[in-house]
């Protein structure tokens, strides 16, 4: 199997010009778990899709002969495929003597994350130094969040779950606008939804699998520690050109025209994602099987309104007091002096100078 995968890797790199670089910093064996497909045995496109498997996470390991986990990959019988994938991946990992990196893409990332949890719960769990995981385009960190945990989707024979936490170092790679890993929070924004659906074709799969972490902006990389004590590094990979308009580029529409369309459409697309919301934005969004609003934003809006009302309420007595003081001072002063002040205000500086000049004339 290693020899076959290695040959495919060489062929793919020769055609695509992808360069493998080491992200591990030390020698380790790589185990690759591909994503879902349908009718694998009779699908005429499957052999072409399989040619891309060697590129899965190619910039996250330096193994020249990665092992490929073979399982059903059946998207229409997901739970069974996932169980089979975990069992087969574990057998591959158990045979490796030394450090290993398990890299899963799409459905393969679900297999990898469940394997990590299973190994951590085993009687003799591997050391943190001996194994790490890379999850590329994980749907359980994306579209699955539309639904509550435990929701059963009959069409896919899949029960919704989240990415399980483990003590092992885990890298997550998410491509912007990828429907499976980065769907809009407001799917009723049809332009945003259509863009994400196109992202399933133009971002998901080989494009995101070939991500080089060195090219991801530092601001788009976060590091956290989960409840199991594992370090989780997340790379959010920007998509410079909207997937929604990629078809026009492919059919030969000049980039200048499509770029202009992108500039018009991107704010509409981004309005479907909470990450672009401004403070105080209370627009609804879909999460965990229900419609929610930004409670913090609502509270900020309420606090701001209350502060404005309080300020006005506090200013009103002050204004009234200043007015009363002014009236009282006017009443205490001689009437003639008040008249003079009023005259000075009406006539302005010139009248004051004229008055001064008149007082200096000899009597």
Task: Give a label for each model feature.
Residues 2-9, 20-106, 110-363:
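Composition-driven, intrinsically disordered low-complexity tracts enriched in small residues
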Residues 13-19:
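Hydrophobic core
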